[in-house]
Amino acid sequence: MDFTNLKNTDPELLDMIKKEEERQEYNIELIASENFTSLSVMEAMGSLLTNKYAEGYPHKRYYGGCEFVDEVEDLARERLKKLFVAEHANVQPHSGSQANMAVYMSVLQTGDTILGMDLSHGGHLTHGSPVNFSGKLYNFISYGVDKETETIDYDQLKKIALENRPKMIVSGASAYPRIIDFEKIREICDEIDAYMMVDMAHIAGLVATGIHPSPVPYADFVTTTTHKTLRGPRGGAILCKEKYAKAVDKAIFPGIQGGPLMHTIAAKAVCFGEALREDYKEYMQQVVKNTKVLGEELKNYGFRLISGGTDNHLLLIDLTNKNITGKDAEKLLDSVGITVNKNTIPFETLSPFITSGIRIGTPAVTTRGFKEEEMKKIAYFMNYSIEHREENLSQIKEQIKEICKKYPLHQNA
């Protein structure tokens, strides 16, 4: 990007941006929730739309001069509805967390009981963690995975639902590598007359391309972020049945937000447009191929994968048999140029600041053009670094840098 003005006005900040640019360029990015946006997305984000206040919704604003940003928001909403075949879309949430908060506030009262996936089993902070607003404002109870299969225990979920009769069941996850059976969860919701909400932030790209079954036909509400597999700007969105549209919109504004970020909404429109193209489907198919190959190679090196493998874009790895914690593995791999995050595993025995595992994903490296052969090399680099962690790993770091040079960010720019 052109930083001519920033170079003159704030070289100190520009230096920080340049260092981050270099880190992204020469590191293998395996954090499952991260991706690289297109230059088009960044151009929209950096546009003068950031100057415009637009409280309210298209054609019902509290400010004048909104006729063109109305067009932008309408375009984003229509593209999102088309992408997921949804009845209503709200593109104003600043984040996935705020999208979730708005759904809760739209139909529930403070203190209502909600059933969500346990954070340590793969859920999310906003699905009831006691340190999060969700756990503080609502009476969350949790379901998890089966100890043997490490996949969602739907029998346990149903049993807990029947015993506690929550007002809402939340599904979706931040560290779950398998297909989620939304139809089965809908049946449980119907049995207890509960709302069904799905947080598809991680798998939105897989859903959009038909690789993962869509929650939209089953759920009353579907929330997502726009910056993970959707490869857009950092932000959130909500899909819902038309009958909940007014309640959801009111929960966002004036409920929990003021003016929407019109430059971000424009960038969301760009990414939704990109996701509607055929090449995006090919990209998502390659993401899954890459993840499966990476998983199999890691298994060949003796790594234990939670649930034995993956159906989506991520892998959850138990490092116990490698005699290294998630925290130490994250630091070690970062030192050679592989970025991962420490992660709790089901039935975790260590602190969430230490963890027994790491979570990795392939959306970002697949965006760069990495394919199956590169996945085999990544598995080798990870295994070698962990097995030889007391040795000098400078040669591994150099090999990683050379691979990154072969697949530059925005190579077609």
Curated annotation (Swiss-Prot):
Keywords: Amino-acid biosynthesis, Cytoplasm, One-carbon metabolism, Pyridoxal phosphate, Transferase. Its EC number is 2.1.2.1. Pfam families: SHMT. The record marks H227 as: Plays an important role in substrate specificity. CDD domains: SHMT. PROSITE patterns: SHMT. It is found in: Cytoplasm. (6S)-5,6,7,8-tetrahydrofolate binds at L119, G123, H124, L125, S351, P352, F353. One of its GO terms (molecular function) is glycine hydroxymethyltransferase activity. Transmembrane segments: none annotated. It is an enzyme of class 2 (transferase). InterPro entries: PyrdxlP-dep_Trfase (IPR015424), PyrdxlP-dep_Trfase_major (IPR015421), PyrdxlP-dep_Trfase_small (IPR015422), Ser_HO-MeTrfase (IPR001085), Ser_HO-MeTrfase-like (IPR049943), Ser_HO-MeTrfase_PLP_BS (IPR019798), SHMT-like_dom (IPR039429). It catalyses: (6R)-5,10-methylene-5,6,7,8-tetrahydrofolate + glycine + H2O = (6S)-5,6,7,8-tetrahydrofolate + L-serine. Its cofactor is pyridoxal 5'-phosphate. Pathway: One-carbon metabolism; tetrahydrofolate interconversion; Amino-acid biosynthesis; glycine biosynthesis; glycine from L-serine: step 1/1. One of its GO terms (biological process) is tetrahydrofolate interconversion. The keyword Cytoplasm applies. The modification N6-(pyridoxal phosphate)lysine is found at K228. One of its GO terms (cellular component) is cytosol. Homodimer. Catalyzes the reversible interconversion of serine and glycine with tetrahydrofolate (THF) serving as the one-carbon carrier. This reaction serves as the major source of one-carbon groups required for the biosynthesis of purines, thymidylate, methionine, and other important biomolecules. Also exhibits THF-independent aldolase activity toward beta-hydroxyamino acids, producing glycine and aldehydes, via a retro-aldol mechanism. Belongs to the SHMT family. This is Serine hydroxymethyltransferase. It comes from Clostridium botulinum (strain Okra / Type B1). The gene is glyA.
